[in-house]
């Protein structure tokens, strides 16, 4: 991910003569999502995005001075991180977590969820070839990505996209999503798979999807 962040930030936007509001953000987000989103969740997103943006900045995440328009937003309220490919978030948030005593495990393969009395209580993880259970203190948050690299799941939940190539990393296989589902966790909107223009299968030419609408057509 490029880490683009959509949020109303009037002081920054007014420098570019951009008019905006939380209500406009809500209406556009709901509209451009085809009306399929949960209105309450969309409202929560747009009303808290500005605070989240400022919180990230307080932790050291840096954004470019100008906001841009981007696919999925259709308005100039998208904040562009200075560091590419999400590295700005990783550096700042990792540093903040370590400062607070959080233990971060890398090169750890989470293979399943661990349940006790019908409740998610941790994860099954393999580190250096050894399998162990990491217990959660309060909750388990699944943030393992999509299933875009799993052709079987794509065919099952979004059959109209079956056979498309992907530029996702192999670990976006939906493994933990399915592990949760086997334990009774409800899944929704599984057919909502984001696609971007790309090269046809078995072709080598590049198709670039530009974000800068001031210099390119998209």
PLM features: residue spans?
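FAD-binding core of FAD-dependent oxidoreductases
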Residues: 1-8, 139, 146-147
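A conserved short coil-to-beta-strand element within the FAD-binding core of flavoproteins
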Residues: 106-119
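FAD cofactor-binding and catalytic pocket of flavoenzymes
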Residues: 14, 199-218
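Conserved N-terminal/central alpha/beta ligand/cofactor-binding core
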Residues: 2-103, 107-109, 159, 217-218
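Glycine-rich loop(s) and the adjacent beta-strand/alpha-helix scaffold that form part
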Residues: 135-200
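Core beta-strand elements of the Rossmann-like FAD/NAD(P) dinucleotide-binding domain
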Residues: 105, 127-139
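Short beta-strand segments that buttress and anchor functional surface loops
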Residues: 122-126
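Short low-complexity, flexible loop/linker segments enriched in glycine and/or proline
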Residues: 2-4, 77-81, 119-121, 202-209
């Amino acid at each position: 991910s490029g880490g683009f962040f959509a949020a109303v930030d009037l002081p920054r936007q007014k420098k570019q003569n951009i008019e905006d509001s939380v209500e406009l953000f809500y209406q556009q987000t709901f509209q451009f999502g085809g009306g399929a989103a949960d209105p309450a969740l969309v409202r929560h997103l747009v009303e808290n995005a500005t605070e989240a943006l400022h919180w990230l900045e307080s932790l050291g995440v840096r954004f470019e001075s100008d906001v841009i328009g981007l696919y999925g937003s259709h308005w100039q309220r998208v904040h562009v991180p200075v560091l590419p490919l999400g590295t700005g978030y990783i550096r700042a948030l990792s540093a903040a977590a370590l400062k607070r005593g959080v233990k971060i495990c890398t090169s750890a393969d989470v293979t399943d969820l661990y349940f006790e009395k019908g409740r998610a209580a941790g994860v099954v993880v393999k580190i250096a070839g050894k399998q162990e259970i990491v217990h959660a203190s309060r909750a388990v948050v699944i943030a393992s990505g999509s299933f875009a690299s799993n052709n079987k799941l794509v065919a099952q939940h979004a059959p109209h996209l079956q056979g498309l190539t992907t530029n996702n990393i192999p670990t976006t296989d939906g493994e933990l999503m399915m592990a949760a589902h086997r334990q009774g966790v409800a899944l929704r909107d599984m057919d909502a798979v984001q696609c971007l223009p790309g090269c046809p299968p078995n072709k080598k030419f590049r198709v670039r999807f530009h974000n800068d609408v001031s210099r390119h057509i998209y």
